[in-house]
Swiss-Prot record:
PROSITE patterns: ATPASE_DELTA (PS00389). F(1)F(0) ATP synthase produces ATP from ADP in the presence of a proton or sodium gradient. F-type ATPases consist of two structural domains, F(1) containing the extramembraneous catalytic core and F(0) containing the membrane proton channel, linked together by a central stalk and a peripheral stalk. During catalysis, ATP synthesis in the catalytic domain of F(1) is coupled via a rotary mechanism of the central stalk subunits to proton translocation. This protein is part of the stalk that links CF(0) to CF(1). It either transmits conformational changes from CF(0) to CF(1) or is implicated in proton conduction. Its main location: membrane. It comes from Zymomonas mobilis subsp. mobilis (strain ATCC 31821 / ZM4 / CP4). One of its GO terms (molecular function) is proton-transporting ATP synthase activity, rotational mechanism. This is ATP synthase subunit delta. The gene is atpH. The lineage of its organism: Bacteria, Pseudomonadati, Pseudomonadota, Alphaproteobacteria, Sphingomonadales.
């Protein structure tokens, strides 16, 4: 498997690579990916969790306790739970989204898949994800893994990033272009 140097060079990439290698060694790549997905979704949706992860007011022990409480609720596997505790203990939980994204990229590289980062104003339904995956697969002529994130600031529509390519169909972008056109 060829690992992208730019991913590996980042802090999140190094943590993701370490987790990926252990998961691969233990035959738990998919289990860890599923658990990271659950935590990533919780991280994206729970403002309090993001604040806790990025806040220097709470001690690392408090963050570790919060993670320990979330693990059974989200049904996170043991390896991922230990990894999340490590991030909390090292004060690196704020880097989780980058780590999860890099891990997904390692999995995609292993499987010769393409990863599409999709940003929407509201969470995509399973049906919408399936439709988008099928259309991207048809266009790219390769298996595609969707990395969906929610950013209400785009107002509507979606932004799709595939490697260095980006398709911005967000309402925010369209309003910005309209405002620029009106300015002359």
């Amino acid at each position: 498997m060829e690992i992208s140097g730019s991913i590996q060079a980042s802090l999140g990439g190094r943590y993701a690579l370490a987790l990926f290698e252990v998961a691969q060694e233990k035959g738990q790549i998919d289990t860890v990916a599923a658990s990271l997905g659950k935590f990533d979704e919780a991280f994206a949706q729970a403002r309090e969790l993001r604040l806790l992860a990025n806040n220097q007011i709470f001690s690392r022990k408090h963050v570790e306790k919060a993670i320990a409480a979330l693990v059974p609720v989200l049904a996170i596997d043991d390896l991922t739970a230990k990894f999340l505790n490590l991030l909390a203990a090292k004060g690196r939980l704020g880097a989780f989204p980058e780590i999860a994204s890099a891990y997904r990229q390692y999995v995609a590289d292993l499987r010769s898949e393409k990863v599409a980062d999709v940003i929407t104003a509201h969470p995509l339904s399973d049906e919408q994800k399936s439709t988008l995956t099928a259309r991207l697969k048809e266009q790219l002529k390769a298996d595609v893994q969707i990395n969906a994130t929610v950013d209400p600031s785009i107002l509507g529509g979606m932004i799709v990033r595939l490697g260095s390519r980006q398709i911005d169909g967000s309402i925010r972008s369209k309003l910005h272009m309209l405002a620029q056109a009106m300015k002359g």
